[in-house]
Amino acid sequence: MSKPRILLNLFHPNINNSRGNKILSERVRDLTELTFRDVYREYPDAKINVEHEQQLLLDHDLIVFQHPFYWYSCPSLLKEWEDRVLEQGFAYPPGIGDKLNGKHWLTVITTGGPEDAYRSGGFNNYTISELLRPFQQTANLCGMKWLPPIVVHSVLPAGIEGFKNISDDEIMKHAEEYREFLEGYTME
């Protein structure tokens, strides 16, 4: 079993005003086998350097996509990144674009809603697993192993009243579990 080279791509349009993603990323960014990137900070104009991004993917084994779960999806720069970087001939189709075959994909998200809102018949009508299917299928098409996502629920900005909102201490507990997961992860 080998220790993976980890690429953590943080996609948050305003990380300085974040609670959840800020705490999560700060807790793991110093891991020795991890390359940490704040993609919004790197591309404030959204002009993605495709060749650079593809090389980063080639140089790593476990690719982590960390972001808030906006409108049942991701921040716009992550969608742009997927459209540009995971291009035909590089990431797909099988047998032609197979550069990512065997790499692992981990999604790490924060939601504003509580866990029970993400179920059949719940406020959001669908489970997180169902809502993340487009990402899972993207990983599948690219020949990557989809890992069960890490989800931190009920993370709202400070000062929002009337909704369940976990404390920074609770977020830190999730951040510790996230760190332990990355530290102990092996490529199998």
Name each model-derived stretch.
Residues 51-136, 142:
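Helix-loop-strand module that forms the ligand-binding subsite of alpha/beta enzymes
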Residues 20-22, 118-120, 159-162:
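Short aromatic-enriched loop/helix-cap "lid" or pocket-rim segments at secondary-structure transitions
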Residues 1-93, 176-188:
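N-terminal beta1-alpha1-beta2 submodule of the flavodoxin-like/Rossmannoid cofactor-binding fold
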Residues 17, 49, 124-131, 163, ...:
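Residue-level preference for long, well-ordered alpha-helices that form the structural scaffold
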Residues 136-188:
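Glycine-rich phosphate/pyrophosphate-binding loop and the adjoining helix
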Residues 8, 36-38, 107, 148-151:
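Structural signal for conserved beta-strand scaffold positions within catalytic alpha/beta enzyme cores
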Residues 13, 112-116, 154-157:
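A short, flexible beta-alpha/helix-coil linker loop
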